[in-house]
A protein has these predicted regions:
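Bacterial N-terminal signal peptides
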Residues: 7-17
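Aromatic- and glycine-enriched pocket-lining scaffold segments that form the walls
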Residues: 137-214, 219-227
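Structural signal for beta-propeller blades
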Residues: 40-43, 101-103, 144-147, 201-204, ...
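Short loop/turn segments immediately following beta-strands, especially the blade-tip
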Residues: 45-54, 105-112, 149-158, 206-214, ...
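Beta-propeller fold detector
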Residues: 54-64, 114-120, 158-169, 216-223, ...
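Beta-propeller domains
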Residues: 195-273
Length: 280
């Protein structure tokens, strides 16, 4: 391809080996890659040259363990999108440690990382992270599926009391690739938190976010237009853009003020098992 497409789509069958989690600091030309090793999770930091070439600048342990979802996850051991996230201001990097049920917060200093703290994820098998301003939510994809809230401070992550919410799932620990929830993220304005449940319920769950950082007691459960909603991003007009693996389709939705998704428009990519999606 000669140009970057607005949406980048990824199918599991096109990949070989483990899919690493990647966060990119475009301003400083630094790329962060999570190794997700069960013996000890680490972040590899690369400097990116003007020609796109990467040079390893350092490796930084997270203080936790990587994890592997149940069989079927050979190309994506965490079965998710968003397991390594750079804060919008580029000053913090947050990584999940699925094998030890913890989350790590780093301070970013160019191509160097300073570990701030390692905290309990509030559930089993943390696999995805969402950040909006100083509010962080972690998706735990094992067990019933717990989303846990944190405040992001200078010294790291601090759990918000009473912020945990369950998705009411019935996964193991580790979860199965197909039934593990795929992603958590905020709407661009931070007013809602969305979770995709993949084949567990084939739904996109939408929570309201209160001014105190806590979520509504239960989400609005929206059936996906096509089966197995995996990952998502947002369009320029605020529409949800979801990758749905069951039919290898991309579907856009309007997000209502009450959390209901409407006006679905789907298009297959002509491939198999579309999983990850990213908008530049």
């Amino acid at each position: 391809m000669q140009k970057y497409a607005p949406l980048l789509l990824f199918a599991t069958l096109a990949l070989v080996g483990t899919q690493p989690a990647v966060a990119q600091d475009r301003g400083s030309g630094v790329v962060f890659v999570q190794t997700n090793e069960p013996s000890g999770n680490k972040i590899d930091v690369f400097d990116r040259g003007a020609d796109g070439r990467l040079t390893l600048a350092g490796t930084f342990p997270t203080g936790g363990l990587g994890g592997v979802a149940a069989p079927g996850s050979e190309s994506d051991h965490l079965a998710s999108q968003g397991s390594l996230v750079l804060s919008p201001d580029g000053r913090a990097l947050i990584a999940v440690n699925a094998g030890s049920d913890t989350v790590t917060a780093f301070r970013v200093h160019g191509d160097r990382l300073q570990l701030r703290n390692v905290v309990s994820s509030g559930g089993e098998f943390p696999a995805s992270v969402a950040v909006h301003d100083d509010l962080v939510y972690v998706l735990n994809s094992g067990g019933t599926g717990i989303v846990q809230g944190f405040q992001l401070r200078g010294d790291g992550l601090v759990a918000i009391p009473g912020s945990a919410r369950t998705l009411g799932l019935a996964n193991g620990d580790p979860p199965d690739f197909l039934t593990a929830p795929g992603q958590v993220d905020f709407t661009p304005d931070g007013g809602k938190l969305l979770v995709t449940t993949k084949a567990s319920t084939s739904s996109i769950d939408v929570f309201d976010v209160g001014t105190d950082g806590r979520l509504s007691a239960s989400p609005v459960v929206n059936p996906s237009a096509t089966p197995v909603p995996f990952a998502f991003t947002f369009g320029s007009q605020g529409r949800l853009v979801a990758g749905e693996a069951g039919t290898s389709s991309v579907t856009t939705y309007a997000i209502g003020t009450g959390g209901t998704l409407s006006d679905p428009k789907s298009q297959s990519d002509g491939q198999v098992a579309l999983c990850w999606i990213h908008r530049r």
